[in-house]
């Protein structure tokens, strides 16, 4: 199931936050005129356009990351997760030569390690791009061009692109030279 089929349709998005901050973040997003706000565990889902997501990235003091949902896929086991991620048109989201990283959160009875979920997800993305383009993207865990978020819950995974880059609490932070 594709989370956004037409450019004029509302996009499915979510902002992550520390647990117990969900009601506070939901109130903050409401104050930012963000449409369709729904608090969930460790995140607040919302709908809107890219401008809404960028506004949250710019003004939210409570969100850690903002993610554009691409798809919800079956994740009852590693093979189902791989197939679901392989079905996503990654060539539309990663430019030629772009680097990627995969952040995984959550587990289930079959997928018990977030590192394994991230590795299997990365394999599916890389294999899809290799089949479509004939070349594999490089992985850059620290500063990727595209950061993919995979959140497993029970037998499903929500797959998206992290729009915030570094965690939002690091805005304006400069490392000592």
Predicted regions and their residues:
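Conserved SAM-binding loop and adjacent beta-strand
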Residues: 174-177
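Accessory substrate-recognition/RNA-binding modules or partner subunits associated with SAM-dependent
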Residues: 2-146, 154-156, 163-172
